């Protein structure tokens, strides 16, 4: 019975595809960081004084975030051919959006005190940027980088559906030939790989930034803290090490000897930080060199880029048909409906997945594990399974997207609940309130603004994700998008991409306006 779920391909083929998927995610994340961090800093008001430069940088960040990675992959496959290169570029450019936005927010929220002290010493602009700004942002940048790597590894298998390399190519083959048992087997493999990556990411995050304490009865075990524990706050380990490199808590030498040292001592923390950095550097080199990325394809594809953009640009409005308009309405409706369904189940479930409101440790662990497993399955894969089970259509796409959004938003809600202040809860408890009354009265009012903000962000993500579900029969604009790409209707393809960008951008503007009015 279980043999039906084992892929028929050779083990080496599956292994190579899985490694290619990891290389796409890792190198793509690095590419996004290389471009996203400078763009994010240029978008910050307290760093870049020139408004035109800020506006240009923000425009690139918004475009990268508003355009789905699958759309980028579709275009790059046409430019560079089927393979890892298209997926790497798609992941990288789409990552710029999230990384750039979060870097901008982090830069604008830094403490101005250290920066003023650095400027008072007569430091130049670059010295101010590194010592006064960057040293405060390092913990946040590490958290953003690791979280983005997790997201990219979850989305990388989807890109193979349009030929962008990795294990998604095998998924597309199974779905096209109706081999759903083997498709489910590959899906389970993807979930296992994502879980492993999340564990490694959590290990790295805790090693660099430290851990947070949970509020569960009893002392959580090491694996509980590592695998299911609370969120990591921007910690002090890296920041303190950067700001005060000469500190050596474990050295036996006297303070006078340390102060006379011209180089920072090799403490355990410094060795750990440099070792992790070296490992990531080696992985980056491997991710670029091991996959079959021919330099000639990069050169040839880049030369075609201007003409390809010109072909994507519509000359008139003939592409804007009634079918396209109705499919865009369906896409928006799928996004709204999936958001509503996800929130309906996520709000109560998040209290079970938060360490300070869960009825017990066992329920907390089970809730966190379930949330992790749901979050690990890409929405497009869930849509394929639902299409096979109940048939194609918008209802199928809505249910599939709701499941994916549930795992995403529940984690954000649970993390916000764990940040609730204990004092207010103690006051409610002193009146004799039970656990439910305490959660509703002492916790929910505290986290309501965060929940509203996260819900609006969820709607933004859901609208963006709903645009690709039609590729596998989940309803919406995705079918026309894929059809235009296959038939080489480039003006129609460009028009659809433009519509997707406008809709997602408008939703983001409206959500930002609502967030500012409510919060």
Question: Which stretches of residues belong to each language-model region?
Answer:
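N-terminal, non-cleaved signal-anchor transmembrane helix
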Residues: 1-26, 30, 201-340, 347, ...
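Hydrophobic alpha-helical transmembrane segments of polytopic membrane proteins
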Residues: 167-204, 477-513
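Generic hydrophobic transmembrane alpha-helix motif, especially the helices
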Residues: 61-95, 371-404
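Membrane-cytosol interface at the C-terminal ends of specific transmembrane alpha-helices
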Residues: 82-148, 199, 392-443, 449-461, ...
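Alpha-helical membrane-interface segments at transmembrane helix boundaries
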Residues: 15-23, 57-64, 150, 325-333, ...
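Hydrophobic positions within alpha-helical transmembrane segments of bacterial inner-membrane proteins
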Residues: 25, 29-37, 41, 45, ...
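Short hydrophobic, aromatic-rich alpha-helical segments embedded in or entering the lipid bilayer
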Residues: 1, 163-173, 300-308, 473-483
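Cytoplasmic-entry segments and transmembrane alpha-helices of multi-pass inner-membrane transporters
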Residues: 39-73, 102, 349-383
């Amino acid at each position: 019975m279980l043999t039906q779920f084992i892929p028929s391909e050779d083990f080496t083929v599956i292994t190579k595809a899985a490694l290619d998927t990891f290389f796409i995610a890792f190198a793509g994340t690095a590419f996004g960081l290389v471009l996203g961090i400078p763009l994010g800093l240029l978008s910050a008001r307290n760093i870049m004084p020139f408004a035109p430069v800020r506006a240009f940088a923000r425009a690139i960040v918004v475009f990268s975030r508003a355009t789905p990675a699958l759309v980028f992959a579709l275009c790059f496959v046409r430019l560079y051919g089927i393979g890892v290169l298209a997926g790497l570029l798609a992941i990288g450019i789409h990552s710029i959006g999230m990384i750039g936005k979060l870097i901008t927010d982090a830069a604008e929220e830094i403490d101005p005190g250290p920066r003023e002290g650095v400027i008072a010493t007569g430091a130049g602009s670059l010295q101010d940027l590194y010592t006064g700004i960057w040293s405060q942002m390092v913990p946040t940048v590490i958290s953003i980088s690791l979280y983005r790597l997790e997201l990219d590894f979850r989305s990388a298998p989807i890109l193979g559906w349009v030929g962008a390399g990795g294990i998604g190519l095998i998924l597309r083959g199974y779905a096209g030939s109706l081999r759903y048992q083997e498709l489910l087997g590959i899906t389970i493999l993807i979930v296992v790989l994502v879980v492993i990556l999340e564990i490694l990411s959590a290990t790295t995050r805790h090693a660099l930034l430290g851990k947070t304490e949970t509020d569960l009865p009893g002392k959580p075990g090491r694996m509980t803290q590592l695998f299911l524990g609370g969120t990591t706050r921007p910690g002090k380990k890296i920041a303190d090490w950067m700001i005060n490199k000469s500190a050596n808590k474990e050295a036996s030498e006297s303070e006078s000897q340390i102060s006379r040292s011209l180089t920072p001592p090799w403490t355990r923390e410094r060795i750990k930080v440099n070792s992790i950095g070296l490992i990531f550097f080696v992985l980056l080199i491997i991710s670029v060199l091991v996959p079959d990325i021919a330099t000639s394809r990069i050169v040839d594809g880049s030369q075609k880029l201007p003409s390809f953009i010109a072909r994507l640009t519509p000359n008139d409005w003939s592409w804007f048909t009634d079918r396209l308009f109705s499919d865009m309405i369906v896409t928006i409706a799928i996004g709204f409906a999936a958001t509503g369904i996800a929130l309906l189940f996520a709000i109560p479930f998040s209290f079970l997945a938060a360490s300070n409101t869960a009825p017990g440790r066992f329920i907390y662990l089970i809730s966190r594990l379930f949330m992790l497993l749901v979050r690990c399955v890409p929405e497009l894969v869930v849509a394929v399974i639902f299409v096979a089970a109940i048939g194609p259509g918008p209802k199928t796409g809505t249910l599939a997207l709701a499941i994916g959004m549930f795992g995403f938003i529940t984690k954000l809600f649970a993390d916000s609940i764990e940040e609730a202040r204990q004092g207010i809860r103690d006051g409610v408890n002193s009146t004799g309130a039970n656990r439910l009354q305490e959660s509703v009265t002492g916790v929910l009012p505290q986290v309501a603004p965060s929940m509203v903000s996260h819900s609006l962000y969820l709607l933004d993500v859901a609208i963006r994700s709903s645009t690709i579900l039609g590729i596998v029969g989940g309803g919406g604009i995705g079918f026309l998008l894929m059809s235009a790409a296959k038939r080489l209707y480039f003006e129609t393809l460009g028009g659809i991409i433009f519509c997707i960008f406008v809709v997602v951008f408008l939703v983001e503007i409206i959500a930002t306006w609502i967030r500012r009015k409510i919060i």
